[in-house]
Regions:
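Structural signal for the N-terminal portions of transmembrane helices
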Residues: 276-286, 350-351, 361-368
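"…together with the soluble PPM/PP2C metallo-phosphatase catalytic core" -> "…together
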Residues: 14, 19, 23-292
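Alpha-helical transmembrane segments and their membrane-interface junctions
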Residues: 95-104, 337-358
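Alpha-helical transmembrane segments and their immediate juxtamembrane interface regions
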Residues: 126-141, 358-396
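Membrane-helix cytosolic exit motif
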Residues: 292-304, 378-387
């Protein structure tokens, strides 16, 4: 989660009364982690759905949920209601490493006949480097927004310069030029798109199941289109995390996962677009919420003369969470309802389009994306009005 999602809402004003000394005392303890009953239930679900892969990912996330490092304190965040582990992204990465080692030793696991240590796309390298930038914040070594921006821009610029194939080169055909100026422009557009989506994904990691649900739909779609085992494996890890995150709220993606997965989504998007498997409109539809929300935030803040990196609690998922919190007693349930509902509306139209083989129909996808934009703006307007009315009633 970015600092933008870490402000305390008015409806949870009581947390403001927690003194700094109290927070320091609490920080010496680890998070509560998953209980025995939760682990047993999840073992039945994940074991039944995913077999040994589900149980492996569950073991990793249970272990991380009990560790003292990388903890997100509920006393410091508006949407979080309990101390949670920020190591969800790390657990998914370790799951991928375990699967990679397993298939290298036993190639039959992946349907191969001989060992092969190469696995996954080459742009895993820059995605991993970008994930490490976010990992510093997970460990309590935060970087300033400007420093993060400079580091991510540098990593992507160097990567695209060294390996131009990582960029969406099919844009040359759309634009109709291959000169040096076009190549420089493509580099700038590629870096800007990746940096923008990394920030969008980091912002969206603010409600249970929101970002992970979008990631899951994206990589399932990528696997459906390419039949690449890597995308299938990462989908398994994401499905395990999604269920654990939504049902318990005890572990979140963290900046390692948000940065790494956002970068990977952007780079995979470039790749499948270059292969002619999807259109730009389909990608916009599939990733609609983080893209629309980050653009809305920047436009609103710049229009007000404020820094676009300033932390506040005016994201649509924060406002919708406050609305659900007034409907249900369980704060974890309200959090999960927020994330799952937004993620479902963001990805389901694209999934339906994909199954109908319309992912190259730019007019259809553009129309659907336009409707999604209108709905997201409407939801933000309604929930913001509800928050203002609720605050007025509270202050009387």
């Amino acid at each position: 989660m970015s600092s933008t999602d870490k402000e305390i809402s008015a409806s949870e004003h009581f947390d403001n009364s927690i003194s700094a000394s109290t927070v320091d005392q609490v920080s010496e303890l680890g998070p509560a982690g998953l209980s025995g009953a939760q682990v047993a239930l999840l073992a039945l679900i994940l074991g039944g759905l995913l077999g040994i892969a589900g149980l492996t990912s569950l073991c990793l996330m249970v272990w991380f949920s009990h560790q003292r490092f990388g903890v997100d304190r509920s006393a410091k965040h508006g949407i979080s209601v309990k101390d949670t582990s920020r190591m969800g992204g790390v657990a998914i990465a370790l799951f991928l490493v375990i699967v990679w080692l397993g298939t290298a030793v036993y190639p039959a696991l992946s349907g191969e006949t001989k060992p092969d240590i190469s696995w996954g796309p080459s742009f895993l390298v820059p995605a991993a480097l970008l994930a490490c930038v976010g990992f510093l914040d997970d460990l309590g070594v935060p970087l300033t927004p400007v420093t993060r921006l400079l580091i991510t821009t540098l990593i992507l610029t160097v990567g695209f310069f060294l390996v131009p194939a990582w960029m969406p080169n099919q844009l040359f055909e759309l634009i109709g030029g291959t000169s040096l100026g076009f190549e420089v422009g493509l580099l700038i557009v590629s870096v800007f798109t990746c940096v923008g989506f990394i920030n969008a994904g980091n912002m969206a990691d603010g409600a249970n199941g929101l970002f992970s649900g979008i990631c899951l739909a994206f990589f399932v779609s990528a696997w459906f289109l390419t039949t690449d085992n890597f995308y299938f494996t990462i989908s398994l890890g994401l499905l395990s995390f999604f269920l654990i995150n939504v049902l318990t709220g005890r572990i979140i993606m963290g900046d390692f996962g948000a940065y790494g997965l956002s970068a990977l989504i952007a780079l995979v998007g470039f790749d499948i677009f270059d292969q002619g498997l999807v259109g730009l409109g389909f990608l916009a539809t599939l990733l609609s919420y983080p893209c629309v929300e980050i653009i809305r935030i920047f436009l609103v803040r710049i229009g007000k003369g404020e820094s676009p990196f300033r932390a506040d609690n005016q994201h649509s998922h924060n406002l919708l969470n406050e609305y659900f919190s007034n409907l249900v007693k369980s704060k974890t349930l309200a959090n999960s309802l927020t994330g799952v509902s937004i993620a479902a509306f963001s990805v389901m139209p694209a999934v339906v389009i994909l199954f109908q083989k319309g992912q190259l129909n730019e007019m259809l996808c553009g129309l659907v994306f336009g409707v999604q934009c209108l709905v997201f703006v409407l939801v933000h307007t309604v929930t913001n009005a509800f928050k203002s009315k609720h605050q007025d009633a509270f202050t009387r």
